[in-house]
């Protein structure tokens, strides 16, 4: 006899019941080693050996289980009462106490069952699932099986026997033939006293008088094996009994003859009307082994005579249970493994428990699997719950379910892959020890709007779904009761990133409530079948690039098969069609990926075949049509495919069309290769001349050919996109993955990469990585989103808008969030990629409106366009945009809206609003809004630079005038990219927690005190350090933010993350952010930084960072912690990488400047000075002087002629000069100047360069501009100080004769200052009017910068401007004293001597002598005067 390892046997006292597995295939009786395990425990408890009775007729052991009607125990066995007395005599005092404890527990349970007898739900349901609560003394006995096992350890008392008899299986072998068994049973009943309570328990369905309602169920008997290692450790160690069973072939054959064959699984067990006192007839259980591993695990066990166990099987009058069993098909597991969303099969497990139970002789005992407390649902809408304490769960029930850290999510009760909806799901299925861990009851659900994800949820984590309003009421109650920060309230609030999906799930669940229960499951699967289909269409093109395209491309383009057609028989591989029956193992509610409508096409040999997924023709022509790996690896082929795909698809995604294009492009590629081979062959044969043929082959095989084709297709596509839209398009808005089909798959960035590798990758990024893949479509002026249903306003504004957004604007409803809007998707009726159009005739029932026009809200109400900065018509008077200080006389002019003079703009702005936007120009003659210059490129001189657009376009913020180049190096970090021309800059969407984060020291002097904090960044300064008047009621914007210089991607910054100190970090571009960091919740305009010295990353906003500059060392607070060591390492790394990044950025700036030439701001070009009232020019001809130069001189009135007018700096008047037209002293009037050009000189700004040599004393150019008096000069200086404009063009001639070349002038206004200039200014009198000319003071070679000394004394209120002339004697300040080279050399030599002497001599500190202050060189000290 073989003992297997998968059965279960338990021995309690003298009664033994177990499950023996009979393998009908091998005809061998198998049992489990649990029999041995149970016997070992019994022996360990008793401490004595018990002999197994042997048959007197032969020496073979007695079989444990036999046919019904046969009793392996002889009729002469001693009765149960005598056996009980013998057992009680062998009991120890400890065992008696345990027996008394068990009896007390049983009595308490019977009393509780008696109290529950009055409930009609209890009658007929006294079984293993009855809701009998445990007593305090039995709190450690969790399950039925453990209670039976513990009772087996205490089976030495009569009460233990009674408990064992009560818990015995109704299939315990009865007496043989019915005679002896009846006598034994009647004798036992006659000796047992039954109280009225016990009779009432029997009447209400208890299985025995002492029934506890916790008898072992069928699952406890045959399904889950139990290993008793944990129990053995708690028992007393005694020598184990050696169990051996030996069956010869004769006995084995006899057992096979007497065993009962198992009936079909679907057969119901019949019940008979026999009395409950009759003997129970049992049938051997035959269960087919599922795996061959169980046969291999079977071992032979023999029973030796010296160590035998005595098994006394007593005939008990046991009550049976009527069981109706319906098993699921055997192939259920296979079908559920293959299908993701398989419909539940029409099978169930129903357990009907009735009292009093009977079993007929023909009934079969079959072990069933059911949960210990709640039965398995049938997966057809039935939910059979035997426990009235548990709720009823039905397929299609809607709940709010909570798993892990997610909030409560709408879900629906669905069957799991095994067909269960309720069951025990142990947290540790591999655990085999018998500890006291509780196994929870869980319900299987699937979640809405979550791609059909499923999970098992505990009932306490389920809430009944009654709509969103009821959920909000419940959540509000929890908030009032526990507070908004409590865990109970937070688990009912979804995260910000999940709100949209959460509301979508609520909508789906709400729609499911309108569907009957019988159709909910099918509807659920249909919904997510569409989701799976859409996800399949969004796969990357590289996944199906190498797939066969014969089913689509070849069927539509049969003529292309003749390119590589070969003779021969064509094979047809036909696949078996998938069954459409929902009960079939191969059924799937989700259509197969290759399942399409079969098409009829003719093969080349004239036969017809079906092509498609079900029957696919594999032909040589189709095989060669498919793109092979060699062709796809060719870059020319990839470029050709990308160009054609972009031209045809137009940012759409259609798997069918793309497969067709792949087939067509492959055929075009094959044709081109054939033509190239023919050209090469003709060239080799000499039919074509070699120079011509080589050039043709070279041009045809180069990548430039594909590039030219791509440019032409791109031009055609742009022209087509610029055509006016008559009707809204029905194509859906492309999603982000669809637009990036041409991109290579992104590689996941690991978190713990070295910082050197990260910075190297950042420096290698191109200038367009932020704009790659963005849409070029316009966006709505209200919701800032693109879409296929955009319509242009029919009025003058010509803005784009959605119809529903216009309705929201009119009604005041909130606009949809960016990214949440879905395009209108109208399913096409044809398979062509072009949208369908309805054919309208005169007899059509409905009139189709063509060209529906919309008018935006502002145009409709006649509201004038407001300021581009404050978005208001009248100038605001708020602290964020204060008025100018001098507002007494010029308030009406400054409050007026100025219109931008740039072409194709027309934006209007207030002069007062330009205070924080220095990129704008508020000049009356040339007003310019801040949206025409890149704020990053002109940040060092916002008001003095103006960059011509050229080929570099601009991306503009939709909420403010911020404008940047369409280059990744110019876009600030955290910018929200809407499309290629519209962005949302980081100034917006600032969280409340980041609104007031500033440093505690002055950014200029690095000291504390009373600070003025910037409103847009963490910088704080002292008011006296900034040297500007700041009112208490107005906000302060620092110079960095005002100039538009925001932190960029790849720059090093100081970052304040949570409560940590300011830490050096680098801003990571979006392409370098690790994938796990991307999944973290963050704000709309946040960006990721990596902290130096660590591998930590974090999302952070603009308000928590400021630029790291050279020389920063951090705070000096030193500790010995690991955090401080990481901080020190981070500061060192930041200081080491800062010059590398700055050098790389300077190289990029030089490359950009070489491509896009910078130009100064526009100005009015004039030739002569213009007087500004009240100043006027007056000519007095009496003051004219004449010279003595004659026309016969070599150079009349020249520099060497000794002309009197030239020596007096007067220009000769042609009417009075004797030289006439030959006079050379007419530079100003004739404007004789060399060829000059304005060039950008980096940190020096714009400068003037000569393009031809200039000799010493030559006239260069006249300095012209507006001539103003001193009062006007003071007013303009104050205006420049308010505007923070440090570009001065004033040249003072006299007190009331000052030339201002700022608004009007010529090229002389671009000449820079130099401490060692090559030109100088001279005041000349021309026709009795003072004019200023610039003359060379040295020979100037070609391409040299022309400079002169500004001679500023006190122009900027005792403040000096830095000088960048680079001269040897440069003072460092404009207008400062020059440094003497000799003095500097002498000081350096003296310092070297002192250093050398200090090495050999010891210095003694000299006594301090009082210093005498000399007022002048002629003054003497006071001591000398006294003497």
Swiss-Prot record:
Residues 395-468, 1049-1111 form the PWWP domain. It catalyses: L-lysyl(36)-[histone H3] + 2 S-adenosyl-L-methionine = N(6),N(6)-dimethyl-L-lysyl(36)-[histone H3] + 2 S-adenosyl-L-homocysteine + 2 H(+). GO terms for biological process: chromatin remodeling; dosage compensation by hypoactivation of X chromosome; germ-line sex determination; methylation; positive regulation of canonical NF-kappaB signal transduction; positive regulation of transcription by RNA polymerase II; regulation of DNA-templated transcription; transposable element silencing by heterochromatin formation. A zinc finger (PHD-type) spans 777-862, 864-932, 999-1044. Residues 1182-1232 form the AWS domain. Residues 89-100, 723-733 have a biased composition (Low complexity). GO terms for molecular function: chromatin DNA binding; histone H3K36 dimethyltransferase activity; histone H3K36 methyltransferase activity; histone methyltransferase activity; transcription coactivator activity; zinc ion binding. This is Nuclear receptor binding SET domain protein. It comes from Drosophila melanogaster (Fruit fly). The gene is NSD.
């Amino acid at each position: 006899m073989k003992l297997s390892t998968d059965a279960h046997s338990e021995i309690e006292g003298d009664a033994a019941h177990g499950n023996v597995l009979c393998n009908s295939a091998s005809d061998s009786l198998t049992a489990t080693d649990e029999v041995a395990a149970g016997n070992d425990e019994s022996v360990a408890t008793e401490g004595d050996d018990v002999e197994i009775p042997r048959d007197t007729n032969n020496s073979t052991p007695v079989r444990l289980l036999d046919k019904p009607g046969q009793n392996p125990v002889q009729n002469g066995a001693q009765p149960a009462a005598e056996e009980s007395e013998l057992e009680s005599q062998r009991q120890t005092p400890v065992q008696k106490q345990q027996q008394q404890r068990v009896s007390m527990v049983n009595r308490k349970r019977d009393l509780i069952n008696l109290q529950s007898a009055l409930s009609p739900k209890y009658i007929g349901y006294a079984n293993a699932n009855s809701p009998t609560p445990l007593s305090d003394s039995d709190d450690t006995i969790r399950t039925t099986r453990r209670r039976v096992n513990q009772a087996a350890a205490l089976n030495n008392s009569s009460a233990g026997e009674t408990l064992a008899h009560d818990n015995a299986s109704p299939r315990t072998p009865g007496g043989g033939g019915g005679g002896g068994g009846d006598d034994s049973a009647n004798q036992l009943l006659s000796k047992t006293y039954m109280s009225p309570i016990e009779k009432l328990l029997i009447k209400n369905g208890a299985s025995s008088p002492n029934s506890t309602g916790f008898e072992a169920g069928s699952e406890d008997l045959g399904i889950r094996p139990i290993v008793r290692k944990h129990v053995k450790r708690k028992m007393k160690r005694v020598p184990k009994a050696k169990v051996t069973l030996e069956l010869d072939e004769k006995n084995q054959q006899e057992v096979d003859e007497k065993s009962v064959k198992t009936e079909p699984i679907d057969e119901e067990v019949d019940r008979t009307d026999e009395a409950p006192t009759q003997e129970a007839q049992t049938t051997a259980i035959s269960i087919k082994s599922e795996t061959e591993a169980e046969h291999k695990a079977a071992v032979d066990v023999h029973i030796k005579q010296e160590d035998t166990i005595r098994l006394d099987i007593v005939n008990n009058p046991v009550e049976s249970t009527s069981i109706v069993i319906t098993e699921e098909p055997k192939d259920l597991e296979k079908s559920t493994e293959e299908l993701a969303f398989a419909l539940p099969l029409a099978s169930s497990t129903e357990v009907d428990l009735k009292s009093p139970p009977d079993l007929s002789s023909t009934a079969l005992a079959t072990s069933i699997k059911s949960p210990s407390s709640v039965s398995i649902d049938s997966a057809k809408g039935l939910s059979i719950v035997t426990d009235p304490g548990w709720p009823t769960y039905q397929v299609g029930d809607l709940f709010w379910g909570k798993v892990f850290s997610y909030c409560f999510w709408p879900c629906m009760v669905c069957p799991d892959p095994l067909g269960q909806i309720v069951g025990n799901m142990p947290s540790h299925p591999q655990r085999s020890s018998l500890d006291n861990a509780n196994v929870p009851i869980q319900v299987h659900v699937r979640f809405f709007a979550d791609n059909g994800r499923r999970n098992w949820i505990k009932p306490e984590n389920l809430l009944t779904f009654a709509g969103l309003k009821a959920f909000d009421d419940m959540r509000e109650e929890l908030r009032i009761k526990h507070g908004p920060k409590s865990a109970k309230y937070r688990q009912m609030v979804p995260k910000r990133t999940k709100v949209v999906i959460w509301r979508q799930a609520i909508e789906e669940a709400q729609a499911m409530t309108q569907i009957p229960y019988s159709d909910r499951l099918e509807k659920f699967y249909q919904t997510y079948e569409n989701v799976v289909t859409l996800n399949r269409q969004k796969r990357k093109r590289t996944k199906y690039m190498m797939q066969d395209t014969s089913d689509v491309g070849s069927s539509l383009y049969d003529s292309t098969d003749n390119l590589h057609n070969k003779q021969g028989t064509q094979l047809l591989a036909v696949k078996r069609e998938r069954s459409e029956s929902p009960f079939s193992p191969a059924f799937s509610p989700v259509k197969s990926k290759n399942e399409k409508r079969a098409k009829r096409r003719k093969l080349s040999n004239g036969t017809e075949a079906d092509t498609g997924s079900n029957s696919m023709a594999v032909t040589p022509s189709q095989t060669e049509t498919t793109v092979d790996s060699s062709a796809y690896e060719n870059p020319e082929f990839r470029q050709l495919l990308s160009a054609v795909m972009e031209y045809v698809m137009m940012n759409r995604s259609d798997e069918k069309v793309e497969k067709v294009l792949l087939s067509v492009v492959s055929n075009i590629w094959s044709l081109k290769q054939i033509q190239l081979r023919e050209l090469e062959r003709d060239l080799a044969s000499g039919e074509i001349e070699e120079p011509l043929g080589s050039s043709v082959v070279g041009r045809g095989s180069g990548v430039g050919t594909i590039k030219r084709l791509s440019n032409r297709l791109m031009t055609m596509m742009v022209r087509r996109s610029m055509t006016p839209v008559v009707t809204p398009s029905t194509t859906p808005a492309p999603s982000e993955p669809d637009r990036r089909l041409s991109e290579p798959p992104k590689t996941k960035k690991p978190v713990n990469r070295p910082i050197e590798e990260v910075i190297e990758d950042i420096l290698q990024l191109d200038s367009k990585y932020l704009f790659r893949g963005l849409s070029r479509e316009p966006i709505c002026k209200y919701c800032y989103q693109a879409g296929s249903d955009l319509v242009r306003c029919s009025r003058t504004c010509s803005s784009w808008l959605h119809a529903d957004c216009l309705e929201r604007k009119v009604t005041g409803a909130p606009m949809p969030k960016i990214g949440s809007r879905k395009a209108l998707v109208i399913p096409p009726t044809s398979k062509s990629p072009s949208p369908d159009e309805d054919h309208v005739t005169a007899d059509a029932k409905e009139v189709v409106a063509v060209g529906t026009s919309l008018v935006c809200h502002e145009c409709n109400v006649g509201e004038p366009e407001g300021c581009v900065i404050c978005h208001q018509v009248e100038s605001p008077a708020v602290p964020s945009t204060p008025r100018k200080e001098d507002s007494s006389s010029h308030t009406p002019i400054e409050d007026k809206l100025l219109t931008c003079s740039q072409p194709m703009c027309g934006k209007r702005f207030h002069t007062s609003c330009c205070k924080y936007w220095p990129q704008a120009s508020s000049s009356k003659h040339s007003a310019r809004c801040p949206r025409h210059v890149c704020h990053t490129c002109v940040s060092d001189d916002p008001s003095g630079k103006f960059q011509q657009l050229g080929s570099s376009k601009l991306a503009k913020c939709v909420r403010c005038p911020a404008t940047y180049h369409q280059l990744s190096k110019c876009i600030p970090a955290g910018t929200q990219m809407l499309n290629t021309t519209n962005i949302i800059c980081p100034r917006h969407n600032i969280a409340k927690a980041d609104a007031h984060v500033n440093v505690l020291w002055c950014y200029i002097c690095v000291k504390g005190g009373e600070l003025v904090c910037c409103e847009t960044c963490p910088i704080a300064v002292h008011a006296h350090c900034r040297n500007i008047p700041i009112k208490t009621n107005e906000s302060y914007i620092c110079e960095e933010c005002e100039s538009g210089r925001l932190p960029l991607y790849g720059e090093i910054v100081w970052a304040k993350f949570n409560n940590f100190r300011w830490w050096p970090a680098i801003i990571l571009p979006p392409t370098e952010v690790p994938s796990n960091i991307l999944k973290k919740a963050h704000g709309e305009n946040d960006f990721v930084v990596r902290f130096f010295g660590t591998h930590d990353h974090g999302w952070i906003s603009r308000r928590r960072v400021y630029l790291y500059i050279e020389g920063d060392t951090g705070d000096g607070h030193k500790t010995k912690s690991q955090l401080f060591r990481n901080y020190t390492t981070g500061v060192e790394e930041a200081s080491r990488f800062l010059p590398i990044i700055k050098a790389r950025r300077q190289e990029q700036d030089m490359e950009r400047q070489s491509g896009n030439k910078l130009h100064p701001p526009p100005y009015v070009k004039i030739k002569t000075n213009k007087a500004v009232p009240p100043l006027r020019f007056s000519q007095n001809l009496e003051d004219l002087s004449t010279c003595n130069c004659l026309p016969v001189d070599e150079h009349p009135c020249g520099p060497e002629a000794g002309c009197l007018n030239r020596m007096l700096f007067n220009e000769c008047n042609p009417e009075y000069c004797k030289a006439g037209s030959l006079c050379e002293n007419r530079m100003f009037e004739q404007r004789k100047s060399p060829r000059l050009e304005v060039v950008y000189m980096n940190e020096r700004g714009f400068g003037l360069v000569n393009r031809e040599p200039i000799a010493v004393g030559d006239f260069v150019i006249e300095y012209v501009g507006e001539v103003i008096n001193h009062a006007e000069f003071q007013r303009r200086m104050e205006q420049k100080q308010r505007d923070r404009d440090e570009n001065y063009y004033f040249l003072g001639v006299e007190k009331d004769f000052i030339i201002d070349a700022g608004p009007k002038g010529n090229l002389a206004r671009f000449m820079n200052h130099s401490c060692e200039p090559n030109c100088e200014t001279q005041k000349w009198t021309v026709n009795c009017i003072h004019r200023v000319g610039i003359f060379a003071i040295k020979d100037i070679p070609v391409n040299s910068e022309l400079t002169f000394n500004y001679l500023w004394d006190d122009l900027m209120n005792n403040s000096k401007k830095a000088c960048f002339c680079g001269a040897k004697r440069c003072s460092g300040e404009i207008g400062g004293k020059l440094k003497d080279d000799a003095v500097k050399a002498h000081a350096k030599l003296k310092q070297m001597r002192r250093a050398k002497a200090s090495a050999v001599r010891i210095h003694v500190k000299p006594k301090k002598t009082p210093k005498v202050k000399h007022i002048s060189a002629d003054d003497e000290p006071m001591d000398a005067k006294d003497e």
